[in-house]
Amino acid sequence: MSKSDYYDLLGVSKSATPEEIKKAYRKMALKYHPDKNPGNKEAEEKFKELSEAYDVLIDQDKRAAYDKYGHNAFDSSGRGGFDFNSGFSGDFSDIFNDLFGGGFRGGRGSSRRHDSGAVGSDLRFDIEITLEDSFNGKKVPISYVTYVKCSSCSGSGSEGSAKSVQCSTCHGVGNVRTQQGFFTIERTCHVCNGEGEIIQNKCKKCSGSGRVRDEVNLLVTIPKGIESGNKIRLNGKGEAGYRGARSGDLYVYSNIQKHKFFTRNGSDLYCNVPIKMTLAALGGHIEMPSIDGTWTKVKVPEGSQNGDKLRLKEKGMPIINSSKRGDMYIQITVETPVKLTKKQKELLQKFDDEPNVDCNPQSTGFFQKVKSFWKDIRSN
């Protein structure tokens, strides 16, 4: 049976760089790895072919021989006579350690029972608080259900003083290997489930796992100035580990409710304040509430325009891990009078008839530009 072209197997061109070859192999190997396809002989064979192709193409000398002689390069009876076995260890854990940083289990002599698989999972909890809670800080009670250490066996999984014995199938390693040609396939030991040990007398409460599901109640301290999306890490408050292994962590994510008055950007607060046309024109003062519960007298400059911003220093939110605060910005919205009486209309008309071009410089200047533009068009 003829072999598939190594480049076609990995889906790369003959000019592919080592990085492109490594990336392509990573993608394909993850798809066909035996651990992801238990009992699938077709996937197992595909994985062998992919690994063989990678081992050749990633090596400069082997690749050169393959490009020149094809598959005959690795057949002692062929023209190239390149000894494939001389450069291949037959243990794919080396390849995967190189590609995935040791992410695949089963390095030589490694013990499954000590790897990260037994560690409890991290958990996430979302809380919703008010802007005032974020300003003042708060202690929030939370409750959730997860795996906790078994109180009967203290997490050991054993009943009473019973001890664990070494698994006779994997000899305490936690995984077993089978040789197929010059390929080594490594799988988790099915007898001890990768623990390397077997409990002779399992705890009745937790069935030997060392953990049970229960409700956890905590009081979480919310720091001053926390923002939406910030997370608080509580070490060891996640899921309990398997048979006394380290517990995961709990991450509490905050979500700040929408405020009826303020909007927030980092440590700064913003609010839109409508004011009368007369106040904007003549100037004056307004009373403004702050997030800290106090009131501040704010000066509105004479001739204030719609959209102008007034800044109140250090009237915003606390800055985390600092004694300082952000600022508060007041954006002015000049309100046009509506439902005027006859007298009010007459007064406004009288005001508008006053020959003072300086009181509305923007609109006066704009319409002068319009007249000039129109005059130029007509003259052309």
Swiss-Prot record:
> Which cofactors does it use?
Zn(2+)
Q: Where in the cell is it found?
A: Cytoplasm
SUPFAM superfamilies xref list = Chaperone J-domain, DnaJ/Hsp40 cysteine-rich domain, HSP40/DnaJ peptide-binding domain
Q: How is the cofactor bound?
A: Binds 2 Zn(2+) ions per monomer.
Under the GO molecular function aspect, what terms does this record hold?
A: ATP binding; heat shock protein binding; unfolded protein binding; zinc ion binding
Q: Where are the zinc fingers (CR-type)?
A: 137-215
- A GO BP annotation: protein refolding
Identify the InterPro entries for this entry: DnaJ, DnaJ_C, DnaJ_domain, DnaJ_domain_CS, HSP40/DnaJ_pept-bd, HSP_DnaJ_Cys-rich_dom, HSP_DnaJ_Cys-rich_dom_sf, J_dom_sf
Q: Which SMART domains match?
A: DnaJ
- One cellular component (GO) term of this entry: cytoplasm
Q: Which residues span the membrane?
A: none
Q: Which residues form the J domain?
A: 5-70
Q: Indicate where this protein is primarily found.
A: cytoplasm
Each CXXCXGXG motif repeat, start to end = 150-157, 167-174, 189-196, 203-210
Q: Is Repeat one of the keywords?
A: yes
Role summary: Participates actively in the response to hyperosmotic and heat shock by preventing the aggregation of stress-denatured proteins and by disaggregating proteins, also in an autonomous, DnaK-independent fashion. Unfolded proteins bind initially to DnaJ; upon interaction with the DnaJ-bound protein, DnaK hydrolyzes its bound ATP, resulting in the formation of a stable complex. GrpE releases ADP from DnaK; ATP binding to DnaK triggers the release of the substrate protein, thus completing the reaction cycle.
Family that this chain belongs to: Belongs to the DnaJ family.
Q: How does it assemble?
A: Homodimer.
Protein name per Swiss-Prot or TrEMBL: Chaperone protein DnaJ
